[in-house]
Swiss-Prot record:
Domain GIY-YIG, chain residue ranges per copy: 12-91
Localization of this protein: Cytoplasm
Gene: uvrC
Classification via SUPFAM superfamilies: C-terminal UvrC-binding domain of UvrB, GIY-YIG endonuclease, RuvA domain 2-like
GO cellular component: cytoplasm; excinuclease repair complex
UniProt family annotation: Belongs to the UvrC family.
InterPro entries for this protein: GIY-YIG_endonuc, GIY-YIG_endonuc_sf, GIY-YIG_UvrC_Cho, RuvA_2-like, UVR_dom, UVR_dom_sf, UvrABC_protein_C, UvrC
Annotated GO biological process: DNA damage response; nucleotide-excision repair; SOS response
Assembly behavior: Interacts with UvrB in an incision complex.
Pfam family, one: HHH_5
Name of protein: UvrABC system protein C
Keywords: Cytoplasm, DNA damage, DNA excision, DNA repair, Excision nuclease, SOS response
The UVR domain, residue ranges: 201-236
CDD domains: GIY-YIG_UvrC_Cho
Amino acid sequence: MFDTKRLTTLPDAPGVYLMKGNGGDILYVGKAKSLRKRVRSYFSKGGESRYHIRFLVGRVADIDVIVTDTEKEALLLENTLIKEHRPRYNLDLRDDKTYFSLRLDMNEEFPRLTIVRRPGRDGARYFGPYSSASAAREVLKQLYKLFPLRHYPLESCRRRRRPCLFYQLRQCAAPCHGLISGEDYQSLAEGAALFLAGKNSDLTRLYRQRMAAAAADERYEDAARYRDLIRAIEVTVEKQKMVAGDGDTDVVGFFRDATDLSVSILFYRGGRLMGSRNYLLDWEMDDAEGLSSFLSGYYNRDVVIPDEILIPFTVDDTDPLGELLTERRGKKTVLRHPVRGTKAELVRLAARNAEAYLHEKREKDSGMEQVLGELKEKLHLTNLPRRIECYDISTIQGRYSVGSRVRFQNGAPDKAGYRRYRIRTVPGTDDFAMMHEVLSRRFRDGHGGDGRPDLIVIDGGMGQLNVLTAILEELGLHGIDAVSLAKSRVERNMSDNEVVRSDERVFLPGRRNPVVLRQNGAPLLLLARIRDEAHRFAITYHQKLRGKGSIRSSLEGIPGIGEKRKRELLKRFGSIRALRQADREQLAAVPSVSPALADAIWKALHGEEPEAP
């Protein structure tokens, strides 16, 4: 129990407080404009009827405070400490989707658009977010018809003897082959940036000016090109409705019922709705502190920061958060709580989205709860398998051997729990020993600092399962369920040319005969999906290592090629195919590769006996 006499000694200054349990574990990290007032509010006599105060008073044994000079410093420190300690009762900002952005670096030679998972802090411009890679690719596909920017890395383009197919389709201006001037290409890139930012009126105004200038200079082909661009842009955007001005705005909606809290963010770019992002939050504090913690955590990650953030109610740290985001973005960002007008309607719309997401998620989870309950019953599990981990091994004749781990939480992939393991200690093709190494590395300190799964699934039969159970016993990890999933087998009866496929089987510890689940039932489909995902994850890593190794093996025996030059060639060309396509001049362009050595490399890659350079 926390000694409330300490409350009078707390400083009346901005800073961060860390609430700790009996074992010294950090339960919650918060920030405050005044540490004394904020922490005292949790223990005030008039507040004990509120759940979050009863919750804290009952569990907090000690509170540490760190004083900062400003609220903005407190905000930064809070985020750092949350990332470091991951307290049980702070928000965990995970959603069930991966989002993508388009990246455009105007400082590149001939700027190119690429799809990235996370915006970086590298001076490039980022547009989005998009809910899937396919959505981002569709935007690119349509964009290239208006703005034919290059599709491939410059090194790849310049190795080609002629422009790529996209040039023939008029979806690439082929700058790498000198078919467009640098000035005109830069104009295309600037136009693409304006279009993606929703600045269509600015873009058409700019192109009208250039069309008029080209016509005045009797450059009629250029004038016609600008005319066609203006028409195409107007046709593209004429059906889009502008509802949020012409800037970039994030609208935050907030919904709470008796048991759950959800947040929805609507992304408006150039005044048009581009997409949304939803979160279901495990939060036991009051709404204002919940929203404050959410905003702080979300916008201190690698996300696109807009001009304006609309929020459903005011929070204490609106001003310092706005200052911090302005500093990170390099442009002014403001947080507003609109109470009337169009922007207030947008906030209410976001709240309705948050409510709809909560009901949809709850309905989906209830269905998955039934599937997990059926798995527990059919496989005689100790635990309801909310967190399932699956392991797989990938190797070819003992070379480039790797292991993988995937994690599913409540029936959905939890990408933060995916891990790859390069096999270090096992020579040859001993799959059992490789699995032993992977599992030992995972659980070497009891739970690997990554929490305990309810159920472990491995691909294979009774042999693989025996390895797993032996490791769990060896490490003293009791109470974790384990099963192995054996793929169906195909058998051919040669006499009547009949093909028979056996059922997939689940092996359990201490039981000789496997359990056969209904083949199209949801429990087996879930296990098979997890098993296949672990296999995909392992084989992707294996192929990556094998691709790197193929370059190295192709260069073995060439005089003058050591590990350093192998790394440089691998970095420059990326694959053995690209390396073989390179001519002598391109090979000699690699640092530390002389013309004579380039000739030796080229001969070795094309089946000729290399000579000492």
